[in-house]
């Protein structure tokens, strides 16, 4: 009480270190989320390319399977065989040998199609999971950005109020 003149002195020095720490933490979180989001987006694009390629390969194999099934069906059609008028040796070469080769190729292509279908399902699941992760990260990032913006706005508002109070106190004093 150096001045005992009855005046009251108000000092309003608001400590903004908590706000600065929180803002710094939010900035770090935003930076980390941006990095993760960028990485996941790259993964998604890569998965999308792989999924497209695998789907196209499976479709092509499916078409080959359909053609081979028709071929095997035709080579088993007695009416068609009789209409061709094959001799015994021609029948052996034109029907039996071709049918055996077509059936073997059909089995191979069906096995390949099964493998490709599994790969498409696996890639599709990974793509969906990555998309969900990206959506989740985007929501978190948006929330962090909003929180940082609000914190900055609140800190700025508090600073202006403090300046106004200090100015009013200076005028009153």
Which residue ranges define each predicted feature?
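Residues at a specific register/face of alpha-helical coiled-coils
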Residues: 2-91, 95-173
């Amino acid at each position: 009480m150096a001045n005992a003149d009855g005046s009251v002195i108000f000092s309003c020095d608001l400590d903004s270190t908590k706000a600065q720490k929180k803002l710094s933490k939010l900035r770090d979180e935003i930076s980390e989320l941006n990095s993760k989001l960028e990485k996941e987006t790259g993964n998604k694009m890569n998965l999308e390319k792989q999924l497209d390629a695998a789907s196209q390969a499976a479709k092509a194999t499916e078409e080959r399977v359909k053609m081979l099934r028709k071929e095997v069906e035709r080579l088993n059609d007695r009416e068609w065989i009789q209409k061709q008028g094959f001799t015994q040796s021609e029948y052996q070469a034109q029907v039996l040998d071709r049918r055996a080769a077509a059936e073997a190729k059909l089995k191979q292509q069906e096995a390949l199609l099964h493998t490709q279908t599994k790969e498409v399902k696996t890639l599709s699941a990974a793509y969906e999971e990555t998309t969900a992760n990206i959506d989740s990260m985007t929501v978190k990032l948006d929330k962090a950005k909003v929180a940082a913006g609000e914190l900055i706005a609140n800190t700025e508002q508090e600073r202006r109020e403090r300046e106004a109070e200090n100015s009013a106190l200076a005028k009153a004093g």
